[in-house]
Design a protein with these regions (language model features):
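C-terminal capping/lid region of NAD(P)-dependent oxidoreductase domains
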Residues: 2-4, 293-303, 311-333
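Mid-domain Rossmann-like dinucleotide-binding core that forms the NAD(H)/NADP(H) cofactor-binding site
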Residues: 128-199
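Glycine-rich cofactor phosphate-binding loops and adjacent beta1-alpha1 units
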Residues: 194-264
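C-terminal substrate-binding/catalytic core of Rossmann-like NAD(P)-dependent dehydrogenases/reductases
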Residues: 255-303
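NAD(P)H dinucleotide-binding glycine-rich loop of Rossmann-like/cofactor-binding domains
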Residues: 93-154
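A glycine-/small-residue-rich N-terminal strand-loop-strand element
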Residues: 54, 72-95
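N-terminal glycine-rich beta->alpha transition that marks the start or flank
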Residues: 3-6, 18-21, 26-72, 84
């Protein structure tokens, strides 16, 4: 990195609101401390969490904060104790409390950086950190027991599409809710059956398909209320995994199916993970990226927009004007 480069362009947050309220400003590049790297971003991946926190005014955000959790780029600087060489391509998932990926340069903890193998494009790598690691964490909540049935909701989405494929690797029968437009693709991947989430009778259809069996686990990506409605479908000693929201109270009476409840909060790693947790994080990320490299993991189709168009692109994601596609933002520095 040229020592004369000390500032960069960044989209900044100033008050709770819509993505269009972000401002494009010049910001100083934060020099890396011990264990940190500066990434020259080449690609930003937009995620629902981005527009949610922009609207919510998170604790610690001040006017001028740079949002964005997922990015891909080149290591331009490294602090003491970092083993990643300069020039290495990495993907990362930034903590919400730190200056994020909506910038030409981002300073991140090396712990959260995933080295991208040759043969994986920036576009594909950008689809891994938030969706892929969330799917991995969700699956890790549930014991790997053979010959089980599980449900994944919203399987047309980035997280659920990856999660469904990881669940299939456990030799589970995987059922999914999704829009009919995704049905053929999901069945081709090996999904046992899909149900239109807009059909009020889909739960009865699932019960009929299961016959005498019950679900071992249900993975929900919708919201807490929706997850609560899935609880009666899960059998004895089963698992309900909430990827979006969490359940504050048990959804079923005590001493019935002994349902286990699980919360998934990927970004909480930045405040609570140990060194061993981060090692597992990077190992999981490496496995996901390698699966992409060898063609063993399908990702959402993507569209690529320009850095100057980031706010309207994020707004399109928020308001459902673009569905079933990952929105990526390319940065030309």
């Amino acid at each position: 990195m040229d020592a004369s480069v000390t500032t960069c362009r960044a989209w900044t947050w100033h008050a709770p609101g819509e993505p269009e309220q972000l401002r494009l400003e010049d910001q100083g590049i934060v020099s890396p401390g011990p264990g940190e790297i500066v990434v020259r971003n080449t690609m930003i991946a937009l995620n629902p969490v981005d527009w949610k926190v922009i609207a919510a005014s998170p604790d610690g955000w001040r006017p001028g904060h740079v949002p964005g959790v997922d990015g891909v780029g080149i290591v331009a600087q490294a602090g003491d104790g970092v083993g990643i060489p300069l020039g290495t391509r990495v993907a990362y998932h930034q903590g919400l409390g730190k200056a994020g990926s909506f910038a030409e340069y981002t300073t991140v903890d090396a712990d959260c950086a995933l080295v991208i193998p040759d043969g994986v494009s920036d576009e594909s790598a950008a689809g891994i950190p938030c969706p892929g690691l969330t799917a991995w964490q969700a699956l890790a909540k549930v014991p790997d027991m053979p010959n089980r049935d599980v449900l994944v909701t919203g399987a047309g989405g980035a997280v659920s599409l990856i999660l469904a494929q990881l669940a299939l690797r456990r030799n589970w029968r995987v059922w999914a809710t999704a829009s009919p437009v995704h049905r053929e693709r999901l069945l081709a991947l090996g999904i046992a059956g899909t149900f239109d989430y807009r059909d009020e009778g889909w739960r009865a259809q699932l019960v009929a398909a299961l016959g005498s069996r019950r679900l071992f686990a249900a993975f929900d990506t919708t919201n807490g209320a929706y997850a609560r409605g899935l609880a009666p479908l899960v059998g004895y000693n089963g698992h309900l995994v909430c990827i979006q929201d969490r359940l504050e109270s048990p959804p079923l009476p005590p001493f019935t199916t002994a349902l286990s409840l699980h919360e998934v909060a990927l970004n909480s790693a930045h405040g609570h993970a140990t060194a061993e947790d981060w090692r597992e994080w990077r190992q999981a990320g490496a496995h996901l990226l390698d699966a992409v490299r060898v063609g063993a993991l399908d990702l959402q189709p993507h569209i690529v927009t320009a850095f100057d168009d980031l706010p309207p692109s994020l707004s399109a994601l928020k308001h459902g004007r673009i569905k079933g596609q990952k929105i990526l933002v390319r940065i030309e520095v």
